[in-house]
Amino acid sequence: MDWKTVQGRSKHEGISFLTITLPDFGKDFERSLDLGQVDRSLFTGFQWKGGLPRFLGGFLDLVFDRASGRLLNKPNVDAVLAIRQLTLMFGKISLPCSDARERKAMLDFIKCEQDVRQSDSERSPIDFEAFCRMSDLLFARMFSRVDREIYYGDIRGKHGPGSTADRLLGNQKYDQQVWTRRLENVFPFGDHIFPSHSYYDLYESVDILEPGMEIPVKVISVPKTLKTPRIIAIEPTAMQFAQQGILRAMLDSLRKDDILPGLIGFDDQEPNQLLARVGSLDGSLATLDLSEASDRVSNQLVRAMLRNHPHLHEAVDAVRSRKAEVRGHGVIRLAKYASMGSALTFPFEAMVFLTLVLMGIERELNQPLCRKDVKHLIGQVRIYGDDIIVPVDTVRSVVGMLEHFGARVNTRKSFWTGRFRESCGKEYFMGEDVSIVRFRKEFPARRKDATQVISLVAFRNQMYYAGYWATCKWLDEELRRILKHYPVVAPSSRVLGRHSFLGYETHKMHATLHSPLVKGYVISARSPQNPLDGPGALLKFFLTKASLNGSSQKMSHLREPDDENHLRRSGRPHAVDIKLRMASPF
């Protein structure tokens, strides 16, 4: 019956049944786990039988009582996992949204800006003072170290591989000729872009933009779900370069702190995931998720955090783009610090949220916190971007504080009542891992659909490790129709193939190395031609091939280039292909 429902509604409603309707069912199921019962306001669009939806009724009966809708005393964890896997699997498939949903996302971006301005105008002096006191308690030492590095000129920028608002790609970024007056006051072009002082005669060719003439960030959408796209902002090359330098200094300084590494993370999600499991096991910890998290962090809050650190304050302001070009709305001035796209968005949003979380805990305890008190909260409080862990007995005060300062808590993805918890891509119920495997790309029709083939092979192998072996058997049959050679390989092999607990295949031995070889398809992705010479090439060598010595970031030794063609080709590949090769199975 369930299979017929999926088949019939998919035929009638199209792919949106799999990508929107079923995921909504899954989210309502998670909400029911948190509430401890099934509410009649949930599961809209599905027929009911008794106190539960008829769809997936066999699984639901193992979790909830059908007569009352209440959670069973001993709910079946396998049934919880099955329902989540079946309903949420296609929720984040990478497909373009409709034009109407794209326009709505851009309009929401504009409305979010208005909300930030409104929140700024309503913030009282008492709020501001409390925020500054907590921020100083947490970050003053860290900021002082970075402030000192900026004063002594120890910051070194870095170019990333992504797109930029001024459309410079790959090696072109090392020949940039545009800077801003605000950057020039903190990070002089000659000191940071010219490889040595002997090139200072080229200064006259540099275009130093005054504040009113700066290039705005370009706001674009990228696939997230079929329901709504993700909104990001593409930064100008100059801003992106300087942001990376400050980011590196901030992360180095944070790691040296005696408290902060235990409360906030930037490159390791596992601590959040482990705490989420604890919360699902004993109910002591809540997991919170924020909507439009980075877009709701006010620039005024960031300025307040840095007010006692003048050099860092000026630098962070200098690398912030003040305007954004929004499709359909023109160029607007930004009230937020920055959207996703700036290298500093992630750390500053996390630091602002940590400050607000501890302010909420302080209010709940009705006493001011000191650093010793904060240290005792390690293992109970953890921030990773907009994924937040807090003690359950402080959650309402924390939520109130976050929303008072302009954040928006996503109640559909925040959990603290029952025994379901979610953080940083892991989900737990009663201490058991009920995380799912997601289908990311459309099904490939032929071998030349390389991106989809690669994604499907990865999906198959994830399903294998999750124990869905019957599904893997069906997927293997489908993949063999697309890939003539589809061997069993180790996870470390670059060959597209099946993973197995039973080892790997060997088709022949290497003639000279006498090591195993297997015939299969490997990923082929070449960076576009992008030749670089002259001072730009020398700058790239100094910036990317220098081993940095601690927080001072001075060169300790120089290494040979990792890619001998890096001065001829650079940037992200325009296309990805798969080619048949003899390669190592491990």
Can you describe what each PLM-predicted range is?
Residues M1-P229, Q462-F586:
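C-terminal, non-catalytic extensions of nucleic-acid polymerases
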Residues I220, R230-I232, A242-Q243, D295-S298, ...:
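Short helix/loop capping segments that flank catalytic or ligand/cofactor-binding pockets
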Residues P223-K227, D282, G328-I332, G431-V434:
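Short acidic (Asp/Glu) and glycine-rich catalytic loops that position anionic groups and cofactors
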Residues A233, T237-L288:
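Active-site-proximal segment of RNA-dependent polymerases
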Residues G265-N272, V398, F405, F429:
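Conserved PLP-enzyme active-site core in the AAT-like
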Residues S280-Y384, I389-F405, R412-E427, A445-K448, ...:
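Conserved polymerase palm-domain catalytic core
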Residues V331, E362-R371, I436-E442, A458-W469, ...:
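Positively charged, low-complexity nucleic-acid-binding target-recognition regions
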Residues T417-Y464:
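A conserved non-catalytic segment of reverse transcriptases
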